């Protein structure tokens, strides 16, 4: 895993085959290496035929749990294998068997947004209001994960939107407001949930949204809730000010960890515990008792890493699903902001990097995931850090680790400012790299003659070009650069330099967006090229068909001309025959003009056998009959040719 780079994405890895090394000189037959899949593994990776075979045999207990406490239905519901879920439900598996954490298959499907699977489970009698050991229902799980359609589906299915988790008194609306899920909040408001419900600390959903900087949600909820008197907010134990202005909304006077986006289903109330770790009394806790969750192993930091001994390093080891194996990979690999709005930096990177630092090993194997939530998390951290520093400046608190932001609010004359604290950030590149655990890359930057000022202008593509190809260190550096531009004051007091630094940050974000747009444009160009090639092929086929049709049409016209000539000859023959018959009738009696039926018996060609025995009137009568038959046949041929020629005619002349 230490050789993985950012060029190997998860979908590409899933498409590749897995191989196993059996040692030097190990020779195994295909029969020995062909190990059959068990039911749980087959359900988790989508092997429908294997699961179907296990169900048809009837020898296995389909409700049996593995070592992690999960059933086959839980794996299929969590990952999203609809056909396997349907197969297991038809076999009669139990839909309400919980995991050791109390999570049912419906909760697992809701946490991943698998709406169709949730529908199947509810049809088979899954309990909609069943709670896990933390008091969370399926609606809580999909709300925390931000699955909009799943929330809408559960509300339409009759889920209780006013349910409260017992530890902190949160409702699903509070969870959505604190997480910044604006559309989900709109769903709850349209559903008619109670907006004035308070948690155990006295905060409403609107207060939580304001606290985490989600002002759109605040404005949305203010239209659905009555305006409270300001005296209620002026209480010493409440927030200072609840104005909707982005410039004046405060952060409570207490330490509160920065909220992470896209939480795992296993974190749940633990995340709420981090958010509401301190009451509303305005006192800041100086120390926190950090206990690793289940599935983690702690390591004591060495004496050399004294700077990093303040944080607790966790290490995830195996499965990204079961907590018995380890917490979800999407949660363990998220990186909390290093430069958080607190009295000091919070040192926590990816879990694998924490283990590497604790053991004094390389951190190249650290891989961070969830790129989509990383951008949203950094945006939330910027707002929280900016507002926190403004609030500290307003109250004269100068013991912050970072000074006020270099945005427009710091321009002289815009508002009264107190005495600025000296810049206490990293003074050189080595210090910054040491803080983020990438000091070993200092030599790479020194070879390229890159100092701190140049480093803070680098983008992700620049780092890759320099030689930083591993995903973990590269993400740490780009995150540190973005956090520095959003919260740190530049080493110079010149307004032009501050403005240039902010523009540089915006240019980096625009460059990322431009790169994505270029990739989309390139994909569209490829599609257009394929469309043009297909159009050229179709046009060539149409031209060939048109040429063949013209040839057939010419041949039909020629055949029709020949048929018309034959018809003209036939008309002349009829005229001659009529004249001959008229003359013969003048010299013979009517008895002799009647043909003898004995001589009209035709052979294979339709003519009488003894032609010499026929009298002239008999021969004339036979000739007249044959001419009539020839006329009918020629008429049919002519009409057939007309039908072939007039392919587009709606009505054809009947023969």
UniProtKB/Swiss-Prot annotation:
May be involved in vasopressin signaling in the kidney. It is found in: Cell projection, Cilium; Cytoplasm. Kidney (at protein level). Pfam families: Ank_2, Ank_4, SAM_1. The gene is Anks3. ANK repeats lie at residues 34-64, 68-97, 101-130, 134-163, 168-197, 201-220. Residues 1-421 are annotated as: Interaction with NEK7. Residues 500-575 form a coiled coil. The modification 3-hydroxyasparagine is found at residue 96. CDD domains: SAM_ANKS3 (cd09519). The modification Phosphothreonine is found at residue 318. Gene3D superfamilies: Ankyrin repeat-containing domain, Transcription Factor, Ets-1. Residues 424-487 form the SAM domain. Residues 314-426 are annotated as: Disordered. The keyword Coiled coil applies. This is Ankyrin repeat and SAM domain-containing protein 3. Residues 378-395 have a biased composition (Basic residues). The modification Phosphoserine is found at residues 2, 5, 201, 225, 243-245, 319, 366, 369, 373, 540. InterPro entries: ANKS3_SAM, Ankyrin_rpt, Ankyrin_rpt-contain_sf, SAM, SAM/pointed_sf.
């Amino acid at each position: 895993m230490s050789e993985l780079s950012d060029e190997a994405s998860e979908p590409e890895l899933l498409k590749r085959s897995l191989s196993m090394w059996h040692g030097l000189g190990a020779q195994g037959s295909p029969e020995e290496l062909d190990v059959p899949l068990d039911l749980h593994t087959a359900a988790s990776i989508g092997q429908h035929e294997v699961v179907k075979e296990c169900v048809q045999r009837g020898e296995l207990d389909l409700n049996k749990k593995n070592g992690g406490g999960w059933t086959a239905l839980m794996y299929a519901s969590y990952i999203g294998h609809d056909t396997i879920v349907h197969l297991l439900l038809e076999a009669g598996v139990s839909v309400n068997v919980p995991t050791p954490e109390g999570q049912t298959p419906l909760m697992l499907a809701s946490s991943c947004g698998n709406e169709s699977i949730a529908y199947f489970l509810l049809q088979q009698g899954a309990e909609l209001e069943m709670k896990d050991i933390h008091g969370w229902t399926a609606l809580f799980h999909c709300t925390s994960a931000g699955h909009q359609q799943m929330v809408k589906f559960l509300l339409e299915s009759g889920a209780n939107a006013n349910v409260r988790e017992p530890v902190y008194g949160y409702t699903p609306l509070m969870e959505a407001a604190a997480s910044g899920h604006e559309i989900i909040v709109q769903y709850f408001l349209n559903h008619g949930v109670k907006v004035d419900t308070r948690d155990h600390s006295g905060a409403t959903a609107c207060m939580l949204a304001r606290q985490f900087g989600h002002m759109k949600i605040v404005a949305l909820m203010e239209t659905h809730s009555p305006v409270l008197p300001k005296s209620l907010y002026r209480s010493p134990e409440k927030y200072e000010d609840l104005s909707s202005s982005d410039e004046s909304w405060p952060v409570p006077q207490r330490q509160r960890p920065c909220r992470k986006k896209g939480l795992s289903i296993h974190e749940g109330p633990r995340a709420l515990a981090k958010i509401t770790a301190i009451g509303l009394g305005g006192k800041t806790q100086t120390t926190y008792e950090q206990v690793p969750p289940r599935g983690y192993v702690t390591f004591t930091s060495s004496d050399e890493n004294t700077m990093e001994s303040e944080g607790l390093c966790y290490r995830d080891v195996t499965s990204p699903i079961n907590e018995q194996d380890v917490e979800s990979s999407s949660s363990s690999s998220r990186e909390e902001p290093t430069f958080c709005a607190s009295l000091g930096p919070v040192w926590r990177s990816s879990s694998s990097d924490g283990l590497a630092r604790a053991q004094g090993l390389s951190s190249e194997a650290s891989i961070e995931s969830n790129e989509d939530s990383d951008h949203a998390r950094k945006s939330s951290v910027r707002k929280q850090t900016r507002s926190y520093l403004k609030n500290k400046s307003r109250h004269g608190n100068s013991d912050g680790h970072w000074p006020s932001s270099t945005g427009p609010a710091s321009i002289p004359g815009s508002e009264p400012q107190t005495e600025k604290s000296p810049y206490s950030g990293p003074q050189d590149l080595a210090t910054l790299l040491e803080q983020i655990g990438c000091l070993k890359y200092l030599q790479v930057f020194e070879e390229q003659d890159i100092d701190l000022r140049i480093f803070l202008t680098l983008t992700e593509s620049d780092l890759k070009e320099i030689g930083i190809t591993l995903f973990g260190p590269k993400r740490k550096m780009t995150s540190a650069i973005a956090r520095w531009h959003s919260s740190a004051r530049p080493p110079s007091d010149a307004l032009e330099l501050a403005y240039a630094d902010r523009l540089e940050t915006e240019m980096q974000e625009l460059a990322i967006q431009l790169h994505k747009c270029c990739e989309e444009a390139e994909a569209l160009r490829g599609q257009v090229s394929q469309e043009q090639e297909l159009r050229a092929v179709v046009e060539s086929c149409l031209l060939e068909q048109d040429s063949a049709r013209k040839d057939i049409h010419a041949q039909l016209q020629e055949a029709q001309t020949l048929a018309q000539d034959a018809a003209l000859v036939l008309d002349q023959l009829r005229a001659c025959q009529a004249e001959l018959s008229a003359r013969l009738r003048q010299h013979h009696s009517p008895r002799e003009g009647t043909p003898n039926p004995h001589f009209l018996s035709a052979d294979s060609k339709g003519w009488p056998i003894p032609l010499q025995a026929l009298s002239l009137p008999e021969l004339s009568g036979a000739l007249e009959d044959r001419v009539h038959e020839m006329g009918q046949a020629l008429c049919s041929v002519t009409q057939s040719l007309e039908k072939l020629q007039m392919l587009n005619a709606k009505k054809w002349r009947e023969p």
